[in-house]
Structure formats: C-alpha cells, structure tokens
Amino acid sequence: MELNSLLLLLEAAEYLERRDREAEHGYASMLPFDGDFARKKTKTAGLVRKGPNNRSSHNELEKHRRAKLRLYLEQLKQLGPLGPDSTRHTTLSLLKRAKMHIKKLEEQDRRALSIKEQLQREHRFLKRRLEQLSVQSVERVRTDSTGSAVSTDDSEQEVDIEGMEFGPGELDSAGSSSDADDHYSLQSSGCSDSSYGHPCRRPGCPGLS
C-alpha cells in the first residue's frame, strides 16, 4: 500500500518537473492517465466552474495540493536515508531514493522471514530430540532400578541360608552323626596304639590273630 502511494507521488513529481521544464519552452505536457486522478480532476474542474471566480479557486486548489505534496515529501525525508547531499535533492531524486530504500527494506524483510522459518524448523527438531532423550533416560533409570532390585533379592536369600537355625531333632541327628564319627576315630586310634602297648582285644582287630 505504501509502495503504491509512493509510485503515485513519483509520477506526480515527474509530471511537475516535466511541466516546469516545458513551461520554460512554451508548451504543456499531459499527465499520465490514472482513473482516480482523472475523476478527482473532473470533480475539481466542476467545482471550479461553479465558483464565481474560477481562476482564484483553481489557484487555491493548486496551492493546497502543493502544500500537501511538500508535507509528504518532508515526512519522506525523515523516514528514509538521504545521504550527504540531502540539501540538493530534487523531488524526483528524493522519490527515487525512497523507492530504492523501500525495495531494500522489503529484501531485508524477506531474508529475516527466511531466517525465522529456519530457526523455527531447528527449534522443532531440537524439541523432538529432547523428548526422545528424555524417554531413553527414563527407560534407562527403570532398567537400572529393576536390576538393583533383583540383586537385592539374591543377597537376601544368601543371608537367610547362612543365618538358618536348626530345631532339636535336627540338632540330635547332627549330634549322633558326629558321635559316630568320633567313635570310629577312637577305634582307629586304639588299634594303632596296640602295636606299641597291649594287644587289641576288640573283634576284628589284627592283633588277635
């Protein structure tokens, strides 16, 4: 929208400068055809013809239009960079420079939009990657906790076996087996001692033969 308004101002400035140059040589120039401008000009001409003093009304309208144009140009000078020779700018050169500046801003806007889209894609990728790493971390923690629970159960079973207590019957059976072992060891030692002292009188002892 601003570019269209600027183009209209550019055409108007070109027309004014061309008309000023042609007025110096004694001939006039036609303004490029524009539907809106033609309708406004027709309406203005009708108002001028209806007035009592056509020439003065036309001069007032022209003065008002030029004042608005100067106001727009001053605003344009404040918005765009003019360079070191800003005081020597004509209306046409000012509008051309403003047009170039608008194109430069549009190009910067396109580049910024492209960078923004690229950053948004990278943000989505990193977000998905973070979610994947979070899921893997939770699964790893769950696996480690399960393995530690299994090792804890095994150690508890070993402790129960080592700390097992025997009842009275189990102790008697264990004691009788140990007494039999002691009795057998005494017999063996008695037979071995008989070779140095008295002969062994137990049946089955080799000293009785």
Swiss-Prot record:
Keyword Transcription recorded: yes
GO molecular-function term, one example from the UniProt record: protein dimerization activity
Region feature (Disordered): 137-209
Region Interaction with SIN3A and SIN3B, annotated ranges: 6-23
Positions with biased composition (Polar residues): 185-195
Source organism, top-level taxon: Eukaryota
Entry's localization field: Nucleus
Main location: nucleus
Domain bHLH residue range list: 53-105
GO biological process: negative regulation of DNA-templated transcription; negative regulation of transcription by RNA polymerase II
Biased composition (Acidic residues): 153-163
Keywords: DNA-binding, Nucleus, Repressor, Transcription, Transcription regulation
CDD domains (UniProt xref): bHLHzip_Mad4
Keyword Phosphoprotein: no
GO cellular component: RNA polymerase II transcription regulator complex
Function (record text): Transcriptional repressor. Binds with MAX to form a sequence-specific DNA-binding protein complex which recognizes the core sequence 5'-CAC[GA]TG-3'. Antagonizes MYC transcriptional activity by competing for MAX and suppresses MYC dependent cell transformation.
Subunit structure as annotated in this protein's UniProt entry: Efficient DNA binding requires dimerization with another bHLH protein. Binds DNA as a heterodimer with MAX. Interacts with SIN3A AND SIN3B. Interacts with RNF17.
Protein name, entry field: Max dimerization protein 4
Organism, as annotated: Mus musculus (Mouse)
Gene encoding the protein: Mxd4
